[in-house]
């Protein structure tokens, strides 16, 4: 099935429980957020992973969900779009949405989360306040944490 982004917006919106009328009303807002208007009629199979993520995130966040699960959604795409998505998640959280963010970016976890569950090989290694869990994680490999840009070190 070679759906275009336009068709995918309607399909995924419907899967999320949105009516075609609601999708019609929010279509431009979805497309504008994704910044992919010129690619709307291109089959998704020709999209990069970052482009697919843009469309998916824009659709999933057009409503004010009770819970948003963002599983590595920001691991693809450019920095500016990641920032835009983080801001959208902050807006949703301030409106009462619970965001479950799955990420390998310690910096992103520090910026976005207040509680963290650290998983290692599928098991809970640590759970608690974000600052405490992130500090424990960075203590294991401060060099890797510095590479991710989340730790300032003195020489």
Could you describe each region identified by the protein language model?
Residues 10, 22-39, 58:
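Conserved ABC ATPase "signature" region
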Residues 127-128:
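ABC ATPase "signature
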Residues 121-122, 137:
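Conserved ABC ATPase "signature" C-loop
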Residues 103-104:
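H-loop/switch region of ABC-family ATPase nucleotide-binding domains
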Residues 61-70, 76:
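A short, proline-enriched helix->beta-strand linker immediately N-terminal to the Walker B motif
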Residues 109-111:
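A short, surface-exposed alpha-helical micro-motif characterized by mixed small hydrophobic
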Residues 82-95:
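Helical segment within the ABC ATPase nucleotide-binding domain
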């Amino acid at each position: 099935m070679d759906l275009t982004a336009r068709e995918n917006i309607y399909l995924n919106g419907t899967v999320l429980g949105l009516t075609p009328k609601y999708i019609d009303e929010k279509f431009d807002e979805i497309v504008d957020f994704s910044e992919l208007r010129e690619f709307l009629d291109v089959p998704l199979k020709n999209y990069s992973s970052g482009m697919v993520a843009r469309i998916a995130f824009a659709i999933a966040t057009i409503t004010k969900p009770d819970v948003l699960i963002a599983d590595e959604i920001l691991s693809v795409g450019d920095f500016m779009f990641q920032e835009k998505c983080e801001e959208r998640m902050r807006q949703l959280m301030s409106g009462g949405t619970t965001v479950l963010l799955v990420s390998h970016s310690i910096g992103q976890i520090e910026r976005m989360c207040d509680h963290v569950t650290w998983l290692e090989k599928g098991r809970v290694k640590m759970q608690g306040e974000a600052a405490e869990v992130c500090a424990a994680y960075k203590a294991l490999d401060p060099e890797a944490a510095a590479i991710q840009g989340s730790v300032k070190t003195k020489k």
